[in-house]
From Swiss-Prot:
<feature type="repeat" description="15-1">
    <location>
        <begin position="257"/>
        <end position="271"/>
    </location>
</feature>
<dbReference type="GO" id="GO:0020003">
    <property type="term" value="C:symbiont-containing vacuole"/>
</dbReference>
<protein>
    <recommendedName>
        <fullName>S-antigen protein</fullName>
    </recommendedName>
</protein>
<feature type="region of interest" description="Disordered">
    <location>
        <begin position="52"/>
        <end position="309"/>
    </location>
</feature>
<keyword id="KW-0461">Malaria</keyword>
<feature type="signal peptide">
    <location>
        <begin position="1"/>
        <end position="23"/>
    </location>
</feature>
<comment type="function">
    <text>S antigens are soluble heat-stable proteins present in the sera of some infected individuals.</text>
</comment>
<feature type="repeat" description="15-2">
    <location>
        <begin position="272"/>
        <end position="286"/>
    </location>
</feature>
<feature type="compositionally biased region" description="Acidic residues">
    <location>
        <begin position="60"/>
        <end position="86"/>
    </location>
</feature>
<feature type="region of interest" description="20 X 8 AA approximate tandem repeats of A-[RL]-K-S-D-E-A-E">
    <location>
        <begin position="97"/>
        <end position="256"/>
    </location>
</feature>
<feature type="compositionally biased region" description="Gly residues">
    <location>
        <begin position="263"/>
        <end position="289"/>
    </location>
</feature>
<keyword id="KW-0677">Repeat</keyword>
<feature type="region of interest" description="2 X 15 AA tandem repeats of S-E-A-G-T-E-G-P-K-G-T-G-G-P-G">
    <location>
        <begin position="257"/>
        <end position="286"/>
    </location>
</feature>
<feature type="compositionally biased region" description="Basic and acidic residues">
    <location>
        <begin position="93"/>
        <end position="259"/>
    </location>
</feature>
<keyword id="KW-0732">Signal</keyword>
<dbReference type="InterPro" id="IPR008825">
    <property type="entry name" value="S-antigen"/>
</dbReference>
<dbReference type="Pfam" id="PF05756">
    <property type="entry name" value="S-antigen"/>
</dbReference>
Amino acid sequence: MNRILSVSFYLFFLYLYIYKTYGKVKNTDQEISNIYGTNYYLRNGFLNGKNGKGNKYEDLQEEGEGENDDEEHSNSEESDNDEENEIIVGQDEAPKSDEAEALKSDEAEALKSDEAEARKSDEAEALKSDEAEARKSDEAEALKSDEAEALKSDEAEARKSDEAEALKSDEAEALKSDEAEARKSDEAEARKSDEAEARKSDEAEARKSDEAEALKSDEAEARKSDEAEARKSDEAEALKSDEAEARKSDEAEARKSEAGTEGPKGTGGPGSEAGTEGPKGTGGPGSGGEHSHNKKKSKKSIMNMLILM
């Protein structure tokens, strides 16, 4: 936007400079008549032209260009000029007087001075315009230079910003990669730790299970041993009891046998009382058979105990 405005201002002032310098023709007849009045032509012999032909004064009167004469000269000067006009128009009349020559010379000097002043003024205006144009051109160049510097600075800043962004992006990527690696390493360590813990737990469980199984087996063995001991003890008690029973039975049988042997003696006697005691003797052998049965039972129990051992 600044560049467009600077170019627009530059073109505008260039147009003004061209218009002031070349847009109007200096020192035309109309401008001279407007500045100095119609008498300028009369005093300088422009009425009939350089070759004495033409009627410039009448043309200016028709166009109304002689009105500025009232502003620059008094009425007395107009009357003198009218007399001079009559003298100039009448080319065939008497020669001009010295007074008219001196007046013409003064007017010519004044005209030259005015022309010099006008030229100086135009030159000053042109110089000012040139200086203004040069200053504007310098300002435009400075503005362009400043814009170029600003553009370079902006580009440098943008490049630095892009480099900083790229560096930040690279650092962020590297940080993410490092974090990912660290996370993977932590996960691997955690997984290894979990696996080790699980393995330890499994081993502990297996050991506990084995110990429990061994304990159960030991308890079972101990229970079996206790049962065997108890059974042995029971069998020993039973054997002792059987032996005691057998011994008691043997003693009883022995007593019965001793009592039974006396029976036949009774039969041999004549007394009835002795004869009646005979049948009791027959009961002795029966009890002896029961004793043999008890002996068989004790033998079986001993055999069973030996088998269990």
